[in-house]
């Protein structure tokens, strides 16, 4: 808990992996963690970003994130990647498209597979946002799978919803 609040990126990533885990024994640990961090959530601005492939979602996020950091803010990016319906894998390549932002000390970029979950997000995106809020990130940017048609859930869990075209 203290490691998350202090902004330790390695521990933040481990906490996210815990809530993303499908193992039964991890569910109890994840629920306990979420209960502990709950009082430290709700202070971030959550921005959902969607659009057709090639619309510039990653470019927008990198530019916005770097500007926010230059103004003394901390930025977390939750990049949801599509999962293959055949092998359940995903590309998880958004970090490579946001190279400059990824180098920033006050940035945290976490790619996550959608795992076939509809709504443009992963089934644990809300819990992942809570972890990033508890870690003190001022902005949490959620990059959806990016079709623009089914990203309705992200609009329900964010403060601002952007559609880029």
Question: What are these model-predicted stretches?
Answer:
Residues 2-45, 55, 64-150, 155-164:
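Nucleotide-state-sensitive switch-loop elements of NTP-binding domains
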Residues 58:
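Walker A/P-loop
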């Amino acid at each position: 808990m203290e490691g998350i609040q202090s902004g330790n990126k390695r521990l933040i990533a481990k906490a996210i992996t815990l809530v993303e885990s499908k193992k039964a024994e991890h569910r109890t640990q994840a629920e306990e963690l979420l209960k502990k961090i709950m009082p430290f959530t709700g202070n971030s601005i959550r921005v959902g970003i969607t659009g057709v492939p090639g619309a510039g979602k990653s470019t927008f996020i990198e530019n916005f994130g770097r500007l926010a950091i230059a103004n003394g803010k901390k930025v977390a990016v939750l990049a949801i990647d599509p999962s293959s319906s055949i092998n359940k894998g995903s590309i998880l390549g958004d970090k490579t498209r946001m190279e400059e932002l990824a180098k920033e000390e006050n940035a945290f970029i976490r790619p996550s597979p959608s795992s076939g979950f509809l709504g443009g997000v992963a089934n644990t995106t809300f819990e992942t946002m809570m972890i990033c809020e508890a870690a003190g990130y001022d902005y949490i940017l959620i990059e959806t799978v990016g079709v623009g048609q089914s990203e309705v859930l992200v609009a329900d869990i964010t403060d601002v919803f952007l559609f880029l075209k």
